[in-house]
Amino acid sequence: MSSRKSKSNSLIHTECLSQVQRILRERFCRQSPHSNLFGVQVQYKHLSELLKRTALHGESNSVLIIGPRGSGKTMLINHALKELMEIEEVSENVLQVHLNGLLQINDKIALKEITRQLNLENVVGDKVFGSFAENLSFLLEALKKGDRTSSCPVIFILDEFDLFAHHKNQTLLYNLFDISQSAQTPIAVIGLTCRLDILELLEKRVKSRFSHRQIHLMNSFGFPQYVKIFKEQLSLPAEFPDKVFAEKWNENVQYLSEDRSVQEVLQKHFNISKNLRSLHMLLMLALNRVTASHPFMTAVDLMEASQLCSMDSKANIVHGLSVLEICLIIAMKHLNDIYEEEPFNFQMVYNEFQKFVQRKAHSVYNFEKPVVMKAFEHLQQLELIKPMERTSGNSQREYQLMKLLLDNTQIMNALQKYPNCPTDVRQWATSSLSWL
């Protein structure tokens, strides 16, 4: 009877943990509008009022949201739109168009996407338009309900705004800003960019039609606020089904936030970047260690997750190389030391390697030249070395100039962790100059 009871308890526990994983992963990955905003309340209020003026009073506006990657630009606009759409008269009337500079790479593709998102494919049909402006005006005209006074407001969100500035003649931006300045259909144009010099990219005619409103997000919070964000991001909501488990989980999160080793981990991440994406990555890796047998996150989980976050991917590749490839990297290291980072070619590396082989009484490392060449090419495929210039068909591979993409510290750290690294190879690496 007791075994049956413990089995049902473990099932409940597993179900609970799967819900925890789902809720927190959703929060970390999607930055859903249900999560809280941190340190951008003033900017949020400004943007929210701007959108309401367009949606409720038919006032056209344009604004740029500027901030580094991961500062919360998308989350800010998503929160503002969510709040706006909760107003009944707005949700039935306002239309949204989301464009991305990485996807809509020219104005023709952008116009097709605008037509699709406004559900006007049937209205456009096979019509032929003289210009981009005429086509866009027709689309917005089609949204009018009856008379000119009851136009349907449209909110345009342009992600990666700086990429739209590279479109030919900036026609899309010109027409959107032109409409926002005129008494046509009420529209709000919201650009999201990480370029501080964005206005310098705009043509004079485009710049003159832009309202010059800018909202800056700079992650200006301090470390105490960062710890508070850590707690809020890990805590379970009040509506979590299992109240007892949620209470225990949140108590554990509170304990973690006060733990000295956890605070050291958070301080390290905070000093590197205030970017909330890096914090979410840290928490995601730590969350992956939570299982039915290990139901609560610990300081060790966060410390190991931090090590994974700061892991050197190039040094990790070195751990999987053959001894011959390691020897070639050491030869390149010595060439860099001797010639002060000057580029090298295969022949120079091969000669350096041969000096090492000749110093040894045994011939364990005595490989044929084509074999060494193959190992050298493999290092190029792994992008541990790169050619200085594009190769021409008739150039000899042995004399093509290369550059090593690892520094001395990375090489030495990788050698320390290299499994069963031969002693003489390690000694060769640590010698101050090559075998001259």
From Swiss-Prot:
Top-rank taxon, per record: Eukaryota
Gene Ontology biological-process annotations: DNA replication initiation; polar body extrusion after meiotic divisions; protein polymerization
Modified residues (N6-methyllysine): K7
Molecular function GO labels: ATP binding; ATP hydrolysis activity; DNA replication origin binding; nucleotide binding
Residue sites binding ATP per the record: G67, P68, R69, G70, S71, G72, K73, T74
Keyword Methyltransferase: no
Predominant subcellular localization, coarse grouping: nucleus
Entry keyword annotation includes Thylakoid: no
One GO CC annotation: nucleoplasm
Coiled coil region boundaries: none
Subcellular location(s) of the protein: Nucleus
Recorded consequence of changing K73 to A/E: Impairs ORC complex formation
Keywords associated with the record: ATP-binding, Disease variant, DNA replication, DNA-binding, Dwarfism, Methylation, Nucleotide-binding, Nucleus
Linked pathology: Meier-Gorlin syndrome 2: A syndrome characterized by bilateral microtia, aplasia/hypoplasia of the patellae, and severe intrauterine and postnatal growth retardation with short stature and poor weight gain. Additional clinical findings include anomalies of cranial sutures, microcephaly, apparently low-set and simple ears, microstomia, full lips, highly arched or cleft palate, micrognathia, genitourinary tract anomalies, and various skeletal anomalies.
Subunit structure: Component of ORC, a complex composed of at least 6 subunits: ORC1, ORC2, ORC3, ORC4, ORC5 and ORC6. ORC is regulated in a cell-cycle dependent manner. It is sequentially assembled at the exit from anaphase of mitosis and disassembled as cells enter S phase. Interacts with DBF4. Interacts with POLQ.
Function comment: Component of the origin recognition complex (ORC) that binds origins of replication. DNA-binding is ATP-dependent. The specific DNA sequences that define origins of replication have not been identified yet. ORC is required to assemble the pre-replication complex necessary to initiate DNA replication. Binds histone H3 and H4 trimethylation marks H3K9me3, H3K27me3 and H4K20me3.
Family, per entry: Belongs to the ORC4 family.
Name listed for the protein in its UniProt record: Origin recognition complex subunit 4
Annotated source species: Homo sapiens (Human)
Gene label: ORC4
